[in-house]
Amino acid sequence: MPLARLVEGEKHDECTYVAASSLLIGRHKMLRSLIYASRRWSSSVGARFSSREELQAYLARPAWQPEDYLPSAEDIARQQLSEEETRKLLKLSGLPEADIQEVRRRLATQLSFVSQLQSVEVDDCADPQYAKAMQRHPAAIGYEELVRRAELDAKDTSLGEKSGSWDSTATATLKKDGYFVLREGLLQKR
């Protein structure tokens, strides 16, 4: 029964209200689907591709070139490290000091590239449709919340993890309530 026929003040049974509300819900769903379809088909980005080859040709055409983001010769010269700094970095990383000049050039290129990446402005208000699942600025948690999360953390048995399987004091000769016991004499012999 259409809702227009339900007149205020008249007595109607429960079935009449159920039928009327289901009709209203059905119309609401139909309207929503029509609005969605009209939004989907009314917006246009460009002409449709007529063939698969046309689509592949469009996708094969680059929209940007890597050279646009690589540093210029001036940037490389400005970012180049001294020989001492390069030797120190090679020593710290355990790499051989074979061709210092080539390593300096590569490091300068990489530093210039990183500088260019850091200079790109990033809008902090991302569109929620494209935002990642992680929050950009997660709130700090307290000690109690950390302990609660650690207790709720389930072990992955497929990786061989067993809950409560590690006892740090199992091999200790002196222990009490899960703690190591140290004698004063051991501390003085240091």
Curated annotation (Swiss-Prot):
GO CC annotation terms, alphabetical: glutamyl-tRNA(Gln) amidotransferase complex; mitochondrial inner membrane
EC number(s) stated in the UniProt entry for this protein: 6.3.5.-
Membrane topology field: Peripheral membrane protein
Subcellular location: Mitochondrion inner membrane
Catalytic reaction equation(s): L-glutamyl-tRNA(Gln) + L-glutamine + ATP + H2O = L-glutaminyl-tRNA(Gln) + L-glutamate + ADP + phosphate + H(+)
Gene Ontology MF term list: ATP binding; glutaminyl-tRNA synthase (glutamine-hydrolyzing) activity
Keywords from the named record: ATP-binding, Ligase, Membrane, Mitochondrion, Mitochondrion inner membrane, Nucleotide-binding, Protein biosynthesis
GO biological process: glutaminyl-tRNAGln biosynthesis via transamidation; mitochondrial translation
Class of this enzyme: ligase
InterPro entries: GatF
HAMAP family the UniProt entry points to: GatF
Complex and partners: Subunit of the heterotrimeric GatFAB amidotransferase (AdT) complex, composed of A, B and F subunits.
Family in the record: Belongs to the GatF family.
More info: This protein may be expected to contain an N-terminal transit peptide but none has been predicted.
Function: Allows the formation of correctly charged Gln-tRNA(Gln) through the transamidation of misacylated Glu-tRNA(Gln) in the mitochondria. The reaction takes place in the presence of glutamine and ATP through an activated gamma-phospho-Glu-tRNA(Gln). Required for proper protein synthesis within the mitochondrion.
Protein name per its UniProtKB record: Glutamyl-tRNA(Gln) amidotransferase subunit F, mitochondrial
Record organism: Eremothecium gossypii (strain ATCC 10895 / CBS 109.51 / FGSC 9923 / NRRL Y-1056)
Gene name, Swiss-Prot/TrEMBL: GTF1
